[in-house]
From Swiss-Prot:
Gene designation: SRR
Residues where S-nitrosocysteine is found: 113
Active site, per annotation: 56 (proton acceptor), 84 (proton acceptor)
Gene Ontology BP annotations: D-serine biosynthetic process; D-serine metabolic process; L-serine metabolic process
Protein name: Serine racemase
Residues noted as binding Mg(2+) 3 in the record, renumbered to the chain: 210, 214, 216
Molecular function via GO: ATP binding; D-serine ammonia-lyase activity; L-serine ammonia-lyase activity; magnesium ion binding; pyridoxal phosphate binding; serine racemase activity; threonine racemase activity
UniProt keyword Isomerase, yes or no: yes
Length: 334
């Protein structure tokens, strides 16, 4: 594997050892109804049941435990990160486990339930504008003021390696899997999974799932160069508004087989379908992968790619904001 990547599979193996006693082995569930709709065998990796309600605890915990093992004589004074919510919760939880103060820079538009959860885990919240530039500038300032260490939500190698442990579990839980479908924002989970899958089972496909309104990963693959979103995207999938970055892009460029995009209505329909048929309260970000498999475009994937695992990335839903559910009921399915 290319030595220019920020992580190798060995890093994922180390992460697995580092975090396995502190996280859940999340289940893989199936749905005969969704199998019937898609004509494929679908498997759902339920990271909504993970500690803090999303996969993000894997990377955050691996990063913080790595910092401590690297400097056992003195813990970091603080850890600092920017997050739309899930990484912030995960970092807060992991920092509290290790007795380290955490500061999370959150856009004011982040779901209220995620902001409250960050505070409940003991972190201090600092608000930013929605743009990447605003979040990163404030994160740097807070890190300087607190003498803290920044833990990037998707470009930090230890975070990427931690997210890759999802694929180690899936390959054991679904031995005959033909493909994984993974939501992508900054690309930490996608990159970690791609490194792991291509190291252990190169024939297994890795597909990225992305909102059409935040399609920087698709555009980057199409153009063959890193192409960030030109402006803050508007999508219900709030967990994947970030663009892929310098560390995740080379892995995605080389190891991800294809990128599929879906509309906002497709995301809403898929999310509600999982709620109603599988009784799983996923957040819309997790619904993006389901929407992809339900989409017309996905029918171009060869029929022999039969056994597909969709990573349900999280379940931190702001129930007070679901005004779109009634509106969606009034529409025909896309």
């Amino acid at each position: 594997m290319c030595d220019q990547y920020c992580i190798s599979f060995a890093d994922v193996e180390k992460a697995h050892i580092n975090i396995r006693d502190f996280i859940h082995l999340t289940p893989v569930l199936t749905s005969s109804i969704l199998n019937q709709i898609t004509g494929r065998n679908l498997f759902f990796k339920c990271e909504l049941f993970q500690k803090t309600g999303s996969f993000k605890i894997r990377g955050a915990l691996n990063a913080i435990r790595g910092l401590i093992s690297a400097h056992p004589e003195e813990k970091p004074r603080a850890v600092v990160a920017h997050s739309s919510g899930n990484h912030g919760q995960a970092l807060s939880f992991a920092a509290r486990l290790e007795g380290i103060p955490a500061y999370v820079i959150v856009p004011e538009t982040a779901p209220n339930c995620k902001k409250l959860a960050i505070q409940a885990y003991g972190a201090s919240i600092v608000y930013s504008e929605q743009s990447e530039e605003s979040r990163e500038n404030i994160t740097k300032r807070i890190a300087e003021e607190t003498e803290g260490i920044m833990v990037h939500p998707n470009q930090e190698p230890a975070v990427i390696a931690g997210q890759g442990t999802i694929a180690m579990e899936v390959l054991n839980q679904v031995p005959l899997v033909d493909a994984l479908v993974v939501p992508v924002g900054g690309g930490g989970m996608l990159a970690g999974i791609a490194v792991t899958v291509k190291a252990l089972r190169p024939s297994v496909k890795v597909y990225a799932a992305e909102p059409l309104n935040a399609d920087d990963c698709y555009q980057s693959k199409l153009k063959g160069e890193l192409t960030p979103n030109p402006y803050p995207p508007e999508t219900i999938a709030d967990g994947i508004k970030s663009s892929i970055g310098l560390n995740t892009w080379p892995i995605i460029r080389d190891l991800v087989d294809d990128v599929f995009t879906v509309t906002e209505d497709e995301i809403k329909y898929a999310t509600q379908l999982v709620w109603e048929r599988m009784k799983l309260l996923i957040e819309p970000t997790a619904g993006v992968g389901v929407a992809v498999v339900l989409s017309q475009h996905f029918r171009t994937v060869p029929a022999e790619v039969k056994n597909i695992c969709i990573v349900l990335s999280g379940g931190n839903v702001d129930l007070t904001s679901l005004t779109w559910v009634k509106k969606q009921d009034e529409k025909a399915a896309p």
